[in-house]
């Protein structure tokens, strides 16, 4: 079963237990496994209403939030190729990536991000805000997740700050392999501890290692606390979690062993 189906099964098993929480202005908002699946369902319904073809690209431009994760899982389940974009990057650099990846639509966390793109690219694909996407759309029947192992599921770009940005295409099988490696490494790091981990996560999801990490945590049934403002990490971090992911250790899980 491709990774997205495994994550959905884990969320269903979590039921009324919290799986994600985000900190915003000192306030914590949490969702259970059931509630996260409901958010995914709403986003899938919105995407299905746009009659997109399998394999079309979906830009994702937002800061780290619960809805970012729901949007990513929804687009993947609908057979789309997600193009995650770093929300702090200059609009003209993001436009260059979009012109290369040609998304059919772009999902934005807020109007400021949307306007920054549209002001720099008059011919941009349709942009939709999360508030629109997660509103309920009635009368749309959803199929089972449309993902096969060989299907491309994401295009992740280099920053483009020191040269032309380059996109790397990953299939569901590629992602599934990395999730297995990362989970195995966490088993080693935790020394056989069986209780569910509590994790504070702040690295932007548009970075590959960060995205793989948070998918791994969902698969493992961990409780993940998301920082939504990088400037507030010192206030958000204390006492929130047992693990604080960094890029090198996570990326190292995928390196070949001698």
Pin down the residues of each PLM region.
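Conserved pre-ATP/AMP-binding loop-to-beta segment of ANL
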Residues: 15-18, 140-157, 163-164, 190-198
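Conserved AMP-binding A3 loop
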Residues: 30-34, 153-180
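Short beta-strand->loop structural element characteristic of the AMP-binding/adenylate-forming
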Residues: 59-61, 68, 72, 76-105, ...
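Conserved AMP-binding/adenylation subdomain of ANL enzymes
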Residues: 176-198, 205-258
